[in-house]
Amino acid sequence: MPAPADREKALDAALAAIDKNFGKGSVMRLGDEVRPPIEVIPTGSISLDVALGIGGLPRGRVVEIYGPESSGKTTVALHAVASAQKAGGIAAFIDAEHALDPDYAAKLGVDTDALLVSQPDTGEQALEIADMLIRSGALDIIVIDSVAALVPKAEIEGEMGDSHVGLQARLMSQALRKITGALNHSGTTAIFINQLREKIGVMFGSPETTTGGKALKFYASVRLDVRRIETLKDGTNPVGNRTRVKVVKNKVSPPFKQAEFDIIYGQGISREGGLIDLGVEHGFVRKSGAWYTYEGDQLGQGKENARAFLRDNPDLGDEIEKRIKEKLGIGARLDAPAEVDVEEKVDF
């Protein structure tokens, strides 16, 4: 075995050759540079940001959001788009389902005039467009809605009864191999919305599975299972849903945490409702009977009145949010564009 000095010299020569051939930084020691905190895009729900462990969806990664129909998958994705845009970012939406409602997106805070939208004809076209946008380096977030609607060209051009086993799975596998590296270099967050199917003949365990094969399960850094658990009513009139999200996979923080929040019809995720829930849980907001109080000030009788009070007094909501994030250690929220210095983006 060569002497330690000779090994170090040989390694330095190899690293110099790699830098010359492939560019500086192609290989580096993790301890050479101080790694900044993971940049994130807030989800619009403080409870979900807390469950994710880092304050939002990680940038430069693949995120999968799946669940039953009308559970709130697209709503969560659109809130993330709105958060990215508010921080000055550029967003794209690949509408493979041809079902995007611009009016609803605008109500959630999405700048629909600036949103890049594509309604592709085939799955290949959708993923090629996504790849080109990601490789431009200008994008902060891209949403593909949905994986189930990414129909391969061969299936579209074939007859209705033809068998096309594994085509979509191969398409997704090839696409994810291409775009994962590009996402990391560009700092773009890619959200894949997915649907549920049931496997036939399952005797034990859950028969539920997602479409598009197994590649997305492997490449995703975060997987969110979105479920509607309750209908919110004003008297007898339904006004929204209580939604539970389980973080079933998380490569950037401990997984399996859960978040619950309210989605109000026509308004999206209730930020104020989330602040009240977490405020009560962590002792910042006091609940006595039906009354909610904060620092001796009454917020209202009943959650709806307290929610309305915080909506009318946004500074108070910001104060509660700041205290919650400081206590839970998720204050280092990096939701500004990637080119901004890390020190400028930290908000405690």
From Swiss-Prot:
Superkingdom of source: Bacteria
Sorted UniProt keywords: ATP-binding, Cytoplasm, DNA damage, DNA recombination, DNA repair, DNA-binding, Nucleotide-binding, SOS response
Binding, ATP: G67, P68, E69, S70, S71, G72, K73, T74
UniProt GO cellular component terms: cytosol
A single BP term in Gene Ontology: SOS response
Keyword DNA repair assigned: yes
Compartments reported by the entry: Cytoplasm
Pfam families: RecA, RecA_C
Disulphide bridges, residue numbers: none
GO terms assigned for molecular function: ATP binding; ATP hydrolysis activity; ATP-dependent DNA damage sensor activity; damaged DNA binding; single-stranded DNA binding
Matching SUPFAM superfamilies: P-loop containing nucleoside triphosphate hydrolases (SSF52540), RecA protein, C-terminal domain (SSF54752)
InterPro entries recorded: AAA+_ATPase, DNA_recomb/repair_RecA, DNA_recomb/repair_RecA_CS, P-loop_NTPase, RecA-like_C, RecA-like_N, RecA_ATP-bd, RecA_C_sf
Main subcellular location of this protein, as a coarse class: cytoplasm
Keyword DNA repair: yes
NCBIfam families given in the database record: tigrfam_recA
Family per record: Belongs to the RecA family.
The protein's role, per its UniProt record: Can catalyze the hydrolysis of ATP in the presence of single-stranded DNA, the ATP-dependent uptake of single-stranded DNA by duplex DNA, and the ATP-dependent hybridization of homologous single-stranded DNAs. It interacts with LexA causing its activation and leading to its autocatalytic cleavage.
Protein name: Protein RecA
Lineage: Bacteria, Bacillati, Actinomycetota, Actinomycetes, Kineosporiales
